[in-house]
Amino acid sequence: MSDKNKEEKVKKIIPSKLETGFQQFLYKTIGIHIPEKMTPNQITLIGAIGGLIGIVCAFIAKFNPLFLIGTICGLICHLICDDLDGYVARTRNMTSKAGGYFDLLTDILHITYLIIALAFAGFVSFEIAIFLVPVYALIIFTAMNYVLYLKEFLFPRLGPIETHLFFIVLCIGSMIFDNAVITICGFEIKFADIVFILGGIPMYYEMIRLQIQLFKRLKLKENEDKE
């Protein structure tokens, strides 16, 4: 292997045991049966289509909350494909920068528009949803800067599987409670609002932690390079 290839090799760091356990389960049960002709980008596309169907279901759940079952199926499809596209790319030596970009782009679009869809459907208040919309995209942006500057693909502690499970719980609760509102200190709050607040706090914390950590490491790296 050339020195250039060694420099470009990215170290993957996954702190979540739930994420690693789920990935290994998928690799052993589904990954080994993926057809040889199927490419990582095709798997990513399947996940993106599943996610898109889930988003559409979230929009029309305004008329019937049971459409959120379709959203849950879309989340599961997207999550599975999000893990398997990387597995196929690595095991079949088909990794590419274009594929990595396509994967991350679909991740960001899926979560962003799912939040918007749930807000339009009335399950979560716009005032709360607007604070959650940028978080996942900023976490991915920060992760990409780890890759760019430190050659590390650092998964956040609250990674893809935790995010997808978060939305699955939200959908199940929204089907049960529909748009029921409770009043706390004069504020009208829905079930999804509570879930968004409880889930949003650690997500914001994780985003800020990763950004500060990256800044400190880059400053340290700059000082070491000057010496």
Spans of model-derived segments:
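Residues that define the loop-to-transmembrane-helix transition and helix capping
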Residues: 41, 69, 97, 126-127, ...
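Alpha-helical transmembrane segments of multi-pass integral membrane proteins
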Residues: 16, 43, 74-75, 103
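Membrane-interface helix starts
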Residues: 36-46
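Acidic active-site catalytic centers that drive phospho-/nucleotidyl reactions
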Residues: 82-85, 103, 107
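Membrane-embedded alpha-helical segments that form the functional core of polytopic membrane enzymes
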Residues: 44-98, 114, 190-203
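Hydrophobic residues within alpha-helical transmembrane segments
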Residues: 49, 73, 102-105, 169
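A feature for the membrane-embedded catalytic helix bundles of lipid/isoprenoid biosynthetic enzymes
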Residues: 2-34, 104-227
